[in-house]
Amino acid sequence: NRVYRLWRGGALLDRMQGQPDPADRNVPEEWVGSTTVSRLPGRPSDEGLSRIALPDGEAVVLKDLIEAFPEAMLGAAHVAHLGTELGVLCKLLDSAARLPVQSHPSAAFAKQHLGSNFGKTEASLILATRPIDGVTPYMLLGFKDGVTEAEFRRIVQAQDIPAQIGTLN
């Protein structure tokens, strides 16, 4: 379930999946057991949704299977709490470029502005890395002490990427 992105990558995923001739392309993410749609403009409306092969070989969308058999797929307690939403998205990611600085919504913001019951809390388990343009990969997390909302807003609006990176730990 490779998902299109504006950046390139995926050679490590190709290698992990035993693909011949691993290469970086615009599908640097593998969404695992996904019931989430990518929503990238101009892409297929079902991109990101995982498909499950049934014993007879028919492929069905996991989200459709869960909606048809919610308690059998997720359990009664899960359905009572979250309905047919998984509430999690697992991605395998291999980027061949520095990813953009990202800010993820809280659940409250997502509900009010994005029509979603979920924010985007993330956890990362790094299995392998590779240099990108000669730079050893690294992850920035959170703001340095003293960075104000007004300062960061100004930097983002100016699209000053080095300054954005400079505000992060």
Regions found by a protein language model. Give the residues of each.
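Transition-metal
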Residues: 1-147
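Active-site glycine-rich loop that binds ribose-phosphate moieties when present
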Residues: 148-169
